């Protein structure tokens, strides 16, 4: 099922910065928030508890990648935080992904990273020594993710349709690199607008700087949300 709220990437260096940002929004507004490595390492698990206590949904974006037992144990801890979604690297293998699913349980969605949206095909081939196309690599990882029993993948919006064809229509495709038209793309190579992401079949979109660094973050959020949901029935 598609998520109507754009997921806001809380790319802040401290707990206080998050509090200042969230204070801009009405207290009754429930947001979907992404906590990444920078914030989690700066603020610790308490940041997740804080956001959940405010009534927000949380995507904990730590991209775990380790041996199966270690990932399973880590996921058991994360399950206690009440996160709504978290992720791992598909490159860790099917056994690692299965272990992660077992450790997390079924109360939260578990998705896998295929190829980072900052990765170009040339970079993948040169540094990862994967001698296929970028799309073929993404499809391979998506199939293995589905085989492992996960809920979906993180992928570029350009890859959503082929991933759903290769897996199933309900397989979640969460797409970062979403930018409204006219906004700088930053360090992401494969980007798309919210409206385009909807048309191509994305289930979740992640937006960071176009909201968090906007002159009016609340207005920017609602403009992106309106664009994302404008064609929903």
Swiss-Prot record:
One cellular component (GO) term of this entry = cytosol
Task: Give the domain of life.
Answer: Bacteria
GO terms for biological process? 'de novo' pyrimidine nucleobase biosynthetic process; 'de novo' UMP biosynthetic process
What InterPro entries does UniProt report for this protein, alphabetically? Aldolase_TIM, OMPdecase, OMPdecase_AS, OMPdecase_bac, OMPdeCOase_dom, RibuloseP-bd_barrel
What does the record give as the active site?
Answer: 63
- Please verify whether the record's keywords include Ribonucleoprotein: no
**Which Gene Ontology terms cover its molecular function?**
orotidine-5'-phosphate decarboxylase activity
Give binding positions for substrate: 11, 34, 61-70, 117, 179, 188, 208-209
Q: Which UniProt keywords apply?
A: Decarboxylase, Lyase, Pyrimidine biosynthesis
**Which reactions is this enzyme annotated as catalysing?**
orotidine 5'-phosphate + H(+) = UMP + CO2
Against CDD domains, the record matches this protein to: OMP_decarboxylase_like (cd04725)
- Pfam families in UniProt: OMPdecase
Please state the Enzyme Commission number of this protein. Answer: 4.1.1.23
Top enzyme class of this protein? lyase
For the keyword Lyase, the answer is yes
What is its pathway?
Pyrimidine metabolism; UMP biosynthesis via de novo pathway; UMP from orotate: step 2/2
Function text: Catalyzes the decarboxylation of orotidine 5'-monophosphate (OMP) to uridine 5'-monophosphate (UMP).
Recorded family membership: Belongs to the OMP decarboxylase family. Type 1 subfamily.
Xref: HAMAP family: OMPdecase_type1_B
Q: What does the annotation say about its assembly with partners?
A: Homodimer.
- The protein here is known as Orotidine 5'-phosphate decarboxylase
Originating species: Streptococcus pneumoniae (strain 70585)
